[in-house]
Amino acid sequence: KPIVIGRHAHGDQYKATDFKVPGAGTVMMTYIPADGSAPVEMKIADYGADGGVVMGMYNYNDSIRDFARASLRYGILRNYPVYLSTKNTILKAYDGSFKDIFEEVYQNEFKAEMDAAGLTYEHRLIDDMVACAMKWEGGYLWACKNYDGDVQSDTVAQGFGSLGLMTSVLMTPDGKTVEAEAAHGTVTRHYRQHQQGKPTSTNPIASIFAWTRGLAHRGKLDGNQELIDFTQALEEVVIETVESGKMTKDLAALVGEGTPYQTTDDFMNSIAENLAARVSA
């Protein structure tokens, strides 16, 4: 079953201020309230003559709250339970805020709807969640902080198959606007072979699923059940085609040495044939 990684794509290490401390001294962190009240100052560390490194990172409660809403809403959309992972035992204030805000949003805005759908929400420590991901069969949404989502999305994709099987969906907090794309890059090496007229065995699955995810959302917005059913059928056909032994080179290599594989065109034709058979059935 799929593992959906929800990545909070704001702040933390990705908007941090870091620098090399050149020598002996003290690094302080200061909060200056906008209302003119007394500043709050905290010591980060004392450095010896050899210096070191320091980093200051941040996030906003509003952004965390929006991420919680997007994660829980997408969990309902996909009919999956939702898990949030943090290290709140160490970062009691920073990660603790993620835990507290998610719980608040869940209880106040989503619990009744998720209960009615038989879905759950739970917070877990990141190390526990990573271990669970290794042994569970999938079928859940894993909400991650920015760095964790960056790393774990690739771990899940490669560990359970191939980057060519991972689709990325960007969603606004209100759930109305999405952008779906293949999570991998442009596969330039294969394109150069294609330009030379050579056959390639490039995995198109992530690109196909990017279209199906986008079209499924269009169907949801328009109340077009026929379109939603088509996207679901196409996704199922792609999976069944691979399970029947027809696949591209990257997947064949995972099955075992000497496993036969198809070219890009042959694989696309196999999917088209199977889809036509499904639609006409």
Task: List where the protein language model places each region.
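Glycine-rich phosphate/nucleotide-binding loop
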Residues: 133-233, 240-244
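A glycine- and small-aliphatic-rich helix-loop capping segment at beta-alpha/alpha-beta transitions
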Residues: 19-27, 98-105, 159-169
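Internal helix-turn-beta structural module
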Residues: 196-202, 220-281
